[in-house]
Amino acid sequence: MSNKDNDLDDDFSLFREAVQGIKKLPQDTIVQQPNRNTKQKEIKRISREASDSEFYFSDEFVPLLNEEGPTRYARDDVSTYEVKRLRRGVYVPDVFLDMHGMTQQEAKRELGAMIAYCVKNEVHCACVQHGIGKHILKQKTPRWLAQHPDVLAFHQAPLEFGGDGALLVLLSIPEK
């Protein structure tokens, strides 16, 4: 065993000789500053989404929606079969937006942000819960959704997703 101890002592002494005179580098103590651009990008993103909601969701434009039966809408290029699948709950929403207690302005902003999120993350189906309440958001939400270019169709949600107080929204996702 003393042979191994001697070998270790020799190794340590060789190492000490090799690193003798080495000094610590001064740049090893520099602290990285956080990137300030992330805050600016977040502020720009929020303002862009707010301006998008103002651009797409007009209160003055009233699209021609079917007044009879459940609330539904489909663009001209969307098959009626897709609307049936939406009505039956074949499409399961990946994103839920609950607008209970929001003002019209907040609801517009959140709706625009949800659609932007869905397009960015390639989510094809979302559920918007507008509630029943005083019927303000219940009337306005379908009008706003019908104006947005990324909305292919929407239909009153099945009971498991909110029934009369919710809409299932089918979104178009641009191909990359």
From Swiss-Prot:
Keywords: Endonuclease, Hydrolase, Nuclease, RNA-binding, rRNA-binding. GO terms for biological process: rescue of stalled ribosome. It comes from the Bacteria. Pfam families: Smr. Coiled coil: none annotated. GO terms for molecular function: RNA endonuclease activity; rRNA binding. Its EC number is 3.1.-.-. Residues 97-172 form the Smr domain. Acts as a ribosome collision sensor. Detects stalled/collided disomes (pairs of ribosomes where the leading ribosome is stalled and a second ribosome has collided with it) and endonucleolytically cleaves mRNA at the 5' boundary of the stalled ribosome. Stalled/collided disomes form a new interface (primarily via the 30S subunits) that binds SmrB. Cleaved mRNA becomes available for tmRNA ligation, leading to ribosomal subunit dissociation and rescue of stalled ribosomes. PANTHER family: DNA ENDONUCLEASE SMRA-RELATED, UPF0115 PROTEIN YFCN. Belongs to the SmrB family. Associates with collided ribosomes, but not with correctly translating polysomes. This is Ribosome rescue factor SmrB. The gene is smrB.
